């Protein structure tokens, strides 16, 4: 997807604020329109009550906030973020996520975090890519919300197989004991930020780690929640 300075990247109309990248009309258009469970982020009958899945077997986090399903046009921008390290794309996507967070706070009293954490990459993968796309989202979010962020709160201590083609059961096994907590989180309200949540195995492993070490609550914020 070509990004043109001064024009909305999606509709190509002039931007009132050129550094935003996405106009307000398109920002509203990319938002998820179906009713979603506030806990797992999957389709549900009521957007303010946990779904039947979460009542029977809740995930280890309390809330999940997402912008959209992993579909165009948002998926195209997420792909560019993941492989090009363009700060203007990161800021624009972080702003979309911020808008979802603030709307959830107004409508449901969403708890704002004391600290946000990114999903870490294995050190060798981080070195090859040169950056962590989750870090690029965390930086502006922490600044706008006035909360703490440290990219070293959680580290990935071993390499894991690529998750894309694994079943949910194999994903869970693949990630077991893959992360280590480096900073104390006792009593803190924590948020895990990622670009895409598919089965939730990665963020579930991190959420369990945070809760075992005394975090008061854990939320997941992501750009795309695969439905």
Swiss-Prot record:
Q: Which Gene3D superfamilies match?
A: 3.40.50.2020
Tell me the Pfam families matching this sequence.
Pribosyltran
**Listed InterPro entries:** ComF/GntX_DNA_util-trans, Competence_ComF, PRibTrfase_dom, PRTase-like
Q: State the family named in the UniProt similarity comment for this chain.
A: Belongs to the ComF/GntX family.
Q: Which PANTHER family does the UniProt record give? A: DNA UTILIZATION PROTEIN YHGH
Function comment? Could be involved in gluconate metabolism.
> What is the protein's given name?
DNA utilization protein YhgH
User: What is the source species?
Assistant: Salmonella typhimurium (strain LT2 / SGSC1412 / ATCC 700720)
